[in-house]
């Protein structure tokens, strides 16, 4: 079962997203802002993050950069009712900034559950090859380290094994 972290300062948004995603079979953790969201990342592993751009104790788009740095391989969907509500040229600038800071996709609030689920499916599908690659590296490292007298493989040798 896929785990999703939802970080938004708006209670109704958090609860609505959690309800939709649980009905679709996801395990969902919610956080009411940046500090609690970052703490959740320290406590658990997630397959996807949904992060509001503008929250208290975070400086706008800075939230995307911080969450992406903490979990660079986890797809991040940036959501905002503010950042993507301006004129078309302003929306495009906000979108480019969010993507350049680490967002995989962006959604403007409010959005329909079907739209969110479609974007989640796209993000998880795109991330799947990397997830399998990482799991394979971990399995090979474990198998090699369990060999009698074997030295722990380095990241470089693991990379060579995985890529041939």
Question: Model-derived features: where do they sit?
Answer:
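C-terminal output helix
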Residues: 99, 105-121
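Helix N-cap/capping motif at the beta->alpha junctions
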Residues: 30-39, 60
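Receiver (REC) domain active-site loop signature in two-component systems and cognate sites
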Residues: 55
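Short amphipathic alpha-helix used as the core "switch/output" element in two-component signaling
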Residues: 39, 61-74, 93
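Two-component/phosphorelay signaling modules centered on CheY-like receiver
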Residues: 11-29, 101
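Active-site beta3 strand of CheY-like receiver
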Residues: 44-50
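Alpha4 helix (beta4-alpha4-beta5 surface) of REC/receiver domains from two-component response regulators
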Residues: 62, 83-105
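Active-site residues of response regulator receiver
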Residues: 52, 80
